[in-house]
């Protein structure tokens, strides 16, 4: 008998382990981003807004802040999906709420990216 690894991968992907893994990976990335965010906050706590805005225009800080916000919202989207799937019994309402949460996160990430690169 030949063991079918592809079938096991597909079964695992549909069983929730993929979602579980995404939650853990985004959580680890958020923990690392939190270290940067705490450092950035503590080093700029006595600065005025102009200096902080100048610091945020540095490429490393721009990328770090974009990653932090995007991963935070994606992590929240994954978590909200689990909560909605577990506690909303009406299928139509459940699917509607999941789509609303996903759209909210995508629009918020897109608006944040535009705001970070807006030079007004």
Curated annotation (Swiss-Prot):
Bilayer topology term: Multi-pass membrane protein
Alphabetical list of Gene3D superfamilies matching this protein: Fumarate reductase/succinate dehydrogenase, transmembrane subunit
Binding site for heme: 75
Keyword flag NAD: no
GO biological process assignments: cytochrome complex assembly; tricarboxylic acid cycle
Keyword Heme: yes
Binding site for a ubiquinone: 87
Gene Ontology CC terms, in alphabetical order: plasma membrane
Molecular functions per Gene Ontology: electron transfer activity; heme binding; metal ion binding
Keyword annotations: Cell inner membrane, Cell membrane, Electron transport, Heme, Iron, Membrane, Metal-binding, Transmembrane, Transmembrane helix, Transport, Tricarboxylic acid cycle
Intervals, Periplasmic compartment: 41-62
Pathway connected to this protein: Carbohydrate metabolism; tricarboxylic acid cycle
Cofactor note: The heme is bound between the two transmembrane subunits.
Protein location: Cell inner membrane
Matching Pfam families: Sdh_cyt (PF01127)
Domain of life assignment: Bacteria
Bilayer-spanning residue ranges: 20-40, 63-84, 95-118
InterPro entries: SQR/QFR_C/D, Succ_DH_anchor, SuccDH_FuR_B_TM-su
Topological region Cytoplasmic: 1-19, 85-94
SUBUNIT field: Part of an enzyme complex containing four subunits: a flavoprotein, an iron-sulfur protein, plus two membrane-anchoring proteins, SdhC and SdhD.
Function comment: Membrane-anchoring subunit of succinate dehydrogenase (SDH).
Name of the molecule in the record: Succinate dehydrogenase hydrophobic membrane anchor subunit
Biological source species: Rickettsia felis (strain ATCC VR-1525 / URRWXCal2)
Gene name for this UniProt entry: sdhD
């Amino acid at each position: 008998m030949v063991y079918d690894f592809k079938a096991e991968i597909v079964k695992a992907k549909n069983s929730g382990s993929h979602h579980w893994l995404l939650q853990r990976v985004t959580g680890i990335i958020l923990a690392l981003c939190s270290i940067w965010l705490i450092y950035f906050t503590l080093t700029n706590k006595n600065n005025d807004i102009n200096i902080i805005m100048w610091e945020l225009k540095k490429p490393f800080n721009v990328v770090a802040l974009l990653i932090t916000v995007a991963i935070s919202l994606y992590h929240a989207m994954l978590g909200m999906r689990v909560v909605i799937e577990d506690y909303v019994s009406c299928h139509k309402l459940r699917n509607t709420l999941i789509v609303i949460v996903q759209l909210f996160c995508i629009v918020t990430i897109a608006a944040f990216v535009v705001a970070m690169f807006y030079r007004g």
